């Protein structure tokens, strides 16, 4: 389970170092085998343990290609996916095309989303964080007890 957030630095080789608190879980759940792709709706990257990505990809692949938006979603989510491996020091190489897609240069925010992570350019995260409009949430979410 991945929760919480962390500010990360991108090194000169385009690598991010996973916080220590997530490393053992990533080794246990996926042997450090991950998939990094463009988030389908937000200006960030989505980082999945490989099996979790495959489950999501299977569900998406079952959607009919007759809808042009479904085809575009598949292109973004599946077509931009890169299999990556966490090295022994907890580093992940972010492919140049994915860095360029979100203008990721030096600072990033890692945001836990339970079964996956989001990786945001630090400035983009600052723009998005705190913009929640509770009134715009579905009633089923508003009724949750926090």
Swiss-Prot record:
GO biological process: negative regulation of DNA-templated transcription initiation
One Pfam entry name: MraZ
Stretches assigned to the SpoVT-AbrB domain: 5-52, 81-124
Source superkingdom: Bacteria
Record carries keyword Glycoprotein: no
Location(s) in or outside the cell: Cytoplasm, Nucleoid
Keywords, sorted A to Z: Cytoplasm, DNA-binding, Repeat, Transcription, Transcription regulation
Entry-linked SUPFAM superfamilies: AbrB/MazE/MraZ-like (SSF89447)
Location (main, coarse): cytoplasm
PROSITE patterns from the UniProt entry: SPOVT_ABRB (PS51740)
Subunit structure as annotated in this protein's UniProt entry: Forms oligomers.
PANTHER family: TRANSCRIPTIONAL REGULATOR MRAZ (PTHR34701:SF1)
Family as reported in the entry's similarity comment: Belongs to the MraZ family.
Protein name: Transcriptional regulator MraZ
Organism for this UniProt entry: Alcanivorax borkumensis (strain ATCC 700651 / DSM 11573 / NCIMB 13689 / SK2)
Gene responsible for this protein: mraZ
């Amino acid at each position: 389970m991945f929760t919480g957030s962390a500010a990360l630095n991108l090194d000169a080789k385009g690598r991010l170092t996973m916080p220590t608190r997530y490393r053992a879980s990533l080794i246990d759940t996926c042997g450090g085998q991950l998939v990094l792709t463009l988030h389908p709706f937000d200006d960030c990257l989505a980082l999945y343990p490989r099996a979790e990505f495959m489950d999501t990809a299977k569900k998406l692949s079952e959607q009919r290609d007759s809808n042009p938006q479904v085809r575009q979603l598949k292109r973004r989510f599946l077509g931009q996916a890169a299999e990556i491996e966490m090295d022994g020091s907890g580093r992940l190489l972010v492919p140049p095309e994915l860095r360029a897609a979100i203008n990721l240069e030096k600072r990033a925010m890692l945001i836990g989303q339970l079964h996956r992570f989001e990786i945001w350019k630090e400035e983009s995260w600052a723009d998005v964080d705190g913009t929640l409009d509770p009134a715009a949430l579905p009633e089923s979410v508003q009724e949750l007890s926090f």
